Amino acid sequence: MMSLLAVLCVLYVWSPAMLTGGLGSTLDSLPRKTVPIGSNGGRLFREEGIWNYTTMLLRDDLNLLILGAREAIFALDLDDITIKKAMLKWEVTRDQQNDCSNKGKDATNDCKNYIRILHKKNDGRMYVCGTKAFNPTCGYLSYADGKLTLEILQEDTKGKCPFDPFQRYTSAMVDGAYYSATSMNFRGSEPVMMRSTEESIRTEFTSTWLSEPNFIHMAHIPEGQSNPDGDDDKIYLFFSETAVEYESYTKVDVSRVARVCKGDLGGQRTLQKKWTSFLKARLDCQVPNTNLPLLVQDVFHLCPDDWTTCVFYAVFTPQSDSSQYSAVCSYKIEDIKTVFSKGKFKAPFNVETSFVKWVMYSGELPDPRPGACIDNHAREKGITKSLELPDKTLQFVKDKPLMDQAVTAEQPLLVKRGAAFTRIVVTTATALNGTSHQVMFIGTKSGSVLKAVNYNGEMVIMEEIQLFDPSEPIKILRLSSSKKQLYVGSEVGVVQLSISECGRYQTCLDCVLARDPHCGWDLDTEHCATINSIHRTRSSTVIQSLNDGDASQCPAIGVSKPVNISFYHGNTVKLGCQPYSNLAQVKWQFNGEPIKPSNTIQILSDGLMIFNASLDATGYYTCSSIETVSQRKYQTQHVAYDVKMWSESGTTASLHHVKEKERTLVAMVVILSLVLAALLIWNLYKGHLSLPCLHRRVKATQNRHEDDANQVQPQRLASSVVNFNSNNNHANDQRYSSSRETDRLSTTAGSTGQMSLKYIDDESEI
């Protein structure tokens, strides 16, 4: 029952309803620009047959990048890593590989020598360690005369380098002393944080101190410098582990930050050769939609000035598949210091015979305070080193190293759904107006790097740069402030990038709306330039707006010249359009009207598809985008197309032209009809034509007179054959036998006045 309550307690603390406040627009941020592999502008180094480029040491004094891989060490030019200065093979022997394989490890992958440790020593040499087929080995590496040389050390390397090449570890070299956090045995079941010196010192082998940890990062903070309390320097350790305070049937992992004092020598009787200053606290990065604590994956510390300004930036990922959110949180050194120096402790409390519950310790603390370094207060009591600490203080630290209060961030700097974050580095950029901004470079599990910055609580991801195939996670990031270069390692190679690629921003709008503190639009040269001291002296000719993204000063952009596109009937036509920003809303228009998707038209992220194109698809297309920044809308026309269809004659035609021809033909028909009507009226008016009704009256009168004529001369008419049908002037083949009869007939017809009308009527039929 108590176990169930413990789990419910964890879920309550991390319930989304408790964590949604204050995040605003940072939840699920989207990169403004996506840069594909072929356009990333980086330099790639890889060697045939070599893998696992995951250990780096920047040697600015030698202008070298020392790169550790699987069974090889490289010295690369720091300005151009494609230039290989030297290479050293450090391979396992056949016997070492067989011995490793006989212990149950995979001969192909596990039983190799993975370079895991690279640190510069005070004398200029480098301390290097490799897994050496599950038999860690260390040595001194030197570079001289264009060659790398290795001196193998015959020393006990347990706890200095991991046995397992795929186990998380961390290390640091501080004033010649080597600090490490890894496992001490072949099985990886003895985790330890230790300092390897003549006075070697380490953690206790107990789950109260370390419970199945994954070590992440180690950092030296010189808190002893100008410290009014006379405090000592600290070594901070970031890791994740199984939470002892949430003991249950289901394991719950949490993130931790621990610290020890640099001058710690261990105890005299209690905690002999063990840390007397080891304290740890839960590290929280609270994100909505997550039911369990996120786990820390990498940490980078940045100190703009002295140690009091140091900030730790950490990336977190979910510990289950129920959430796809990764986050970045930051922690001030003063906040961490306060938890350890003034916070309350947790103590184990036996609830049942098989269950221990950790609760806040409310009793009296020993003096000096457990876990404190030797400071002015301890010196006042006559204690000058940890060997002189009382057993009561040491026993408290041994039993209760866990703080009750967690180290928390105000709110995540960045939350993003999708590929998990893996690594982070941070640099400071000075803007055009002289203000400083912390720019983060975040590696992902999908082989890309995010460039992001926070403006007054608003997180802006300027770009996502794809460096490797999506199946290759980013495994290491290193930043050279002097070279302004980023070095990114993976299983398959290393890429060198400039921290500012302002040339990617093609227009003033694109440059200013990117809100990149490294970049500004130069009105004199009309291109996006890297901000430097020269620009700051003539800031009136450079446009940069980081907090507001105000691009109103940008010159107006003219309408783009249309691109002519022709197609055959039934083709599929694609009209490309790639907006500058993923945050912009794309707007397609056809002959000035918005386009809606249909069975024949599909709007894609990079263009417009027209299926089974016909004459109806011809016309004028435009692609524009509207980007909203700080409630301001900026519209850009990216491309225009004049689309025509090939006709059977081999010429192009558009629906617009066809309709113009149709309208012209209709107009000509109307005009011709009007002309014909006018001619008809004119002929009627002149009497050249008669109406049908008049023709019927004339014909009736003619027939009446013909009857009268037949009554006067019946015999003569009977002996004559005359055709008076309407076509008698054209189809009458009979002739009169004598002109006398013709003359008489003409005279008779003329006396009645009907014959000439008959002839007029016949003409009208023509």
From Swiss-Prot:
Residues 27-499 form the Sema domain. Glycans are attached at N52, N433, N564, N612. Gene3D superfamilies: Immunoglobulins (2.60.40.10), ligand-binding face of the semaphorins, domain 2 (3.30.1680.10), YVTN repeat-like/Quinoprotein amine dehydrogenase (2.130.10.10). Residues 555-640 form the Ig-like C2-type domain. Keywords: Disulfide bond, Glycoprotein, Immunoglobulin domain, Membrane, Signal, Transmembrane, Transmembrane helix. Residues 724-750 are annotated as: Disordered. Residues 686-766 are cytoplasmic. One of its GO terms (molecular function) is semaphorin receptor binding. SMART domains: PSI (SM00423), Sema (SM00630). It comes from the Eukaryota. One of its GO terms (biological process) is positive regulation of cell migration. This is Semaphorin-4E. It comes from Danio rerio (Zebrafish). The lineage of its organism: Eukaryota, Metazoa, Chordata, Craniata, Vertebrata.
